[in-house]
Swiss-Prot record:
EC number(s) on file: 2.3.2.29
Main EC class the enzyme belongs to: transferase
HAMAP family xrefs: Bpt
Species in which this protein is naturally found: Teredinibacter turnerae (strain ATCC 39867 / T7901)
Cystine residue pairs: none
InterPro entries from the UniProt entry: Acyl_CoA_acyltransferase, Asp_Glu_LeuTrfase, N-end_Aminoacyl_Trfase, N-end_Aminoacyl_Trfase_C, N-end_Aminoacyl_Trfase_N
GO biological process, one term: ubiquitin-dependent protein catabolic process via the N-end rule pathway
Entry keyword set: Acyltransferase, Cytoplasm, Transferase
Annotated family: Belongs to the R-transferase family. Bpt subfamily.
Name of the protein described by the UniProt record: Aspartate/glutamate leucyltransferase
Subcellular location(s) of the protein: Cytoplasm
Reaction it catalyzes: N-terminal L-glutamyl-[protein] + L-leucyl-tRNA(Leu) = N-terminal L-leucyl-L-glutamyl-[protein] + tRNA(Leu) + H(+); N-terminal L-aspartyl-[protein] + L-leucyl-tRNA(Leu) = N-terminal L-leucyl-L-aspartyl-[protein] + tRNA(Leu) + H(+)
Chief location of this protein within or outside the cell: cytoplasm
Length: 243
């Protein structure tokens, strides 16, 4: 019996959906006492699971299948015209990789981002305990990409997990005053290039929901696949747009 088959799953009670109004959601969690390692989490990611801190979950709503796992085919990705403009605009940034963001500089940026951009969400107000519990994991797969300008000002932080067959974009937060740089987009483009350089075929972007406009950006990175009926399927972009 594989490690995956031995895992216990627990379902939450129905609760208000974070993405669709007037909808209730149910979430399945992996047993929090289970031993998770890089290999097992990579396998779980291939089945559409994500993490919040060290808690591994997947939507499991009885009457709704709107949350569709999506991953970009990094090895065949080519930036489009607007993405090339974004790369050019941010060519002055210096990116460094770290194994921790347990410092005041990074937390201050996170706090500003949450308080100014997501004051209507369940992560507001930001605090250090929630910051650590949400972004970090215990499995040694997480890296933090810090984006700085020529004055060494910290403009953005991207949290990324290294899987066996790709990278997983966990979260990105950035300076709200640098909105014109499109730093969220730039962070994804940077991670796609990192995946390609590391010969990893995919960049996992979490869930895509057609009716949720804040998730529209995930289909801007092509080609991509979606997990449909437990199979990763290459998506015809024109069919997604027309539906």
């Amino acid at each position: 019996m594989t490690k995956l088959a031995q895992l216990k799953l627990y379902a939450t009670r129905p609760h208000p959906c974070s993405y669709l109004d007037d909808q209730e959601a149910t979430t399945v969690f992996i047993d929090p006492n289970a031993t998770i390692d890089a290999s097992l989490y990579s396998e779980l990611s291939a089945y559409g699971f994500r993490r919040s801190g060290s808690h591994v979950y997947r939507p499991h709503c009885e009457q709704c299948q709107a949350c569709i796992p999506i991953r970009v085919c990094a090895d065949s990705f080519t930036p489009n015209r607007s993405q090339k403009r974004c790369l050019k605009l941010n060519a002055d940034l210096v990116v460094s990789e770290h194994d921790s963001i347990d410092n005041e500089e990074c937390f201050s940026l996170y706090e500003r981002y949450i308080n100014e951009r997501h004051s209507d969400g369940d992560m507001y107000p930001a605090d250090k305990t929630q910051y650590r519990d949400f972004l970090t994991s215990e499995w040694g797969i997480t890296r933090f990409l810090l984006f700085r300008d020529a004055q060494q000002s910290l403009l953005a932080v991207a949290v990324v997990d290294r899987l066996e067959n790709g990278l997983s974009a966990v979260y990105t937060f950035f300076d709200p005053d640098a909105e014109k740089r499109s730093l969220g987009r730039f962070a994804i483009l940077y991670q796609l290039e990192q995946a390609k350089q590391q010969q990893l075929p995919y960049l996992y972007l979490g869930y895509w929901i057609r009716a949720c406009t804040k998730m529209n950006y995930k289909t801007d990175y092509q080609p991509y696949q979606m997990l449909i009926n437990q199979n990763w399927v290459n998506i015809d972009v024109s069919s997604v747009i027309k539906r």
